[in-house]
């Protein structure tokens, strides 16, 4: 057998390692968990375990149960039976002979030890008794000797006492005389002290009586009903008797106190202390209790006459209750002040800094605004940015209307086929690329042109230096072209106009110039500042001139940036990759971004684990105006967030968490307030249909664009509600949320995973996949149109003129009519018109032609018409027959 480790042996025997180590120790072998065990040691352990198993005691267990019933007498003469079960258990152990011999030897040794101890105790007691007897005999001899000496001394004293008796009698007489004189002096001193104490007590009593009289007249008079104490009955005679009894008791107390004060004081110090106590009591009570009845309780604290103005420190958000505590006023007063200012709030509602400042200043306090982002400012300022600025490449954003050729133009510049990769041939993300030309490097941002991507275009305009406005020569200025011009003007960015599709026969560049001039984009030949370049992305004409125009504009701008030091930039786009996690496309503005840097990006932070350029190649660093994809963030940042490299990851995490908390607080503080204009909307809120949507997309910008577009579809009757949105595939959580809220699951360029598909199948959820935003918006419009209540329209189908009126015993007045227009149908709603004024609206009850009931009468025929519940039909009236049709409404 080969050696094995103790841990493996424990696993083989299915026992714990500690127990196996203990068994080896019991067998006399010291082992640890990692030691090896030989075959000999295994045999030793096995023999030890067998000995233990053989030598183990045999046990015999006897159990016995007895059951009985006990009758317990209860209330009402009824008895209750209780079942009692007694269980007994005895265990007999059969020991082996060796153990029995060992126990017998131990018992024998114990008995011998007890016998030896008993004998030693008896001998010790005998010795102690003998010693005690000897001590008592010695003491008896001493006592006898002392008594003998005492008798001899008494006989000698008897003789001497007779000689001194005469001298003692004379001394005692002298001593008695001195004691009598001292007693007389002491008695006189006590009488003088008592007389002084009595005079002092009378003076104090007189003073107390006088003060009681003054308080009686100066105290606030109380009502007659309240002068008496508590009564135990409501009878008037009984209450009077109680009052009389109270007065007698009070008078007796007063007399008792006065008598005590007038009694002679006892002798010594006790008399003085007693007199002092009586004097103090008399001063407090004031005679017969007059002062107690006349006094009234008064509050010692005086309320300040004027309000106290405080310095109130207010953060970015604060609750109404906290603001009230800082101003040392009640919360209701703060709420009243807010209502006077036109804002309604509860005591636990969070208000923003501006509102709190207005309320505090309205209540007369001085406000100190506190900045809570000191840590954030410290982290952002602790950066290396002291290097000299160097020229950098321009960042160019290509903007324009959808399908005007923006991506195709950039595609020709980069000599790649990017447009074919976009769904439907339209751009739905910001594409960031940098291109090396003969005259230098240019960074391009390609933005979507669809109407839904307004915020994405606005971000592109803010992050750029130059805007290239692409306008199709055959199409002219379109809505998104105007919007791109507005974004460029808002960002203060120069515009270079690229008139595309110049190779088409219907191209009209002059028309483009005229239309753009209406929006403030004037060509240089007209005295403006914008360069116009005629290009064709398909044929490649004018591309070099466009690049030269861009570089010329960049030279005029003198673009510079710090190349060394810690980088900063902006998030162009972000998405969640299933294999790589959160990925952000970052455009570096200044500094150099290195792999391994700690970045703070909006609400997220992290260390750059990897960087890739637009071609998917790994790079180690990125300088100014270079777009890169970075991995390693804690979450998906929002597009447009600032990216900053910081020194400390712990501080970056604190700042990110602080930003998340403040964003939530500010969002709660700025929620919809209860204003008058919202009350009517809230009243009709229950009548509004809702289309709930859970939206997942591949990138953050698409989520933003689709959410904005869908929310704009809402009407007064049907509202779109985005229950949840995010970046990445559809997960089980999204499916559960959609099932709970009865929502439609929408995936834009993403798919559901296996667990989500199971939930979708089991719950029969509506799951839609899209890759083009047009289709998504159209289908949501169709779903909303199905929720609209149909429109009811009245369509006139016939008109009849009353020529004569007949009387019928069954129907009343019957109008003999001639059908002048359309068809008259039975049981249709009608109107009776007199002089083109509606005088009755009801139902056509009877329609006859030649005494036969018919269902309809056509134009040019005569008929008899009976109007239900109406008899005032006259000759010359017009009867108008109509029907109500439903028209399905659609979302515009």
UniProtKB/Swiss-Prot annotation:
Residues 425-429 are annotated as: G2. GTP binds at residues 400-407, 446-450, 500-503. GO terms for cellular component: cytosol. GO terms for molecular function: GTP binding; GTPase activity; guanosine tetraphosphate binding; translation initiation factor activity. Keywords: Cytoplasm, GTP-binding, Initiation factor, Nucleotide-binding, Protein biosynthesis. InterPro entries: DNA-bd_dom_put_sf, EF-G-like_DII, EFTu-like_2, IF2_assoc_dom_bac, IF2_II, IF2_N, P-loop_NTPase, Small_GTP-bd. Residues 93-159, 166-216, 270-282 have a biased composition (Basic and acidic residues). It is found in: Cytoplasm. Residues 446-449 are annotated as: G3. One of the essential components for the initiation of protein synthesis. Protects formylmethionyl-tRNA from spontaneous hydrolysis and promotes its binding to the 30S ribosomal subunits. Also involved in the hydrolysis of GTP during the formation of the 70S ribosomal complex. This is Translation initiation factor IF-2.
